[in-house]
């Protein structure tokens, strides 16, 4: 493979990882964006609404280490694909939530999207030499 071809592949992987991270980040904030509507529709208390908003944030933070480890073991492409599928499904079914419990469950899965940063860092680093990783990672996240 030529250097030019390898650079093109690396750039394409960077774009795909960045777009995936952006979409995951949007899904990660989905619950908080719609929290006022959920509160009104389901009659949630302030405390319940706060818990609903906190679940994805906390899970995203806690899941970064395991997601990073999975990325090291199985590769970013597989882990990102599985995560993206789970998050997309959770985001698609959020409107079907009929109870606070269902929303918490969906928020849990959306919280996994917060760990996408750790996946992308390992994935992007793999495609770039050390001299270019700072720039690539700066563009990624």
Range-by-range predicted roles:
Residues 29, 57-65, 115:
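Residue-level signature of mid-helix packing/kink "hotspots" within the transmembrane helices
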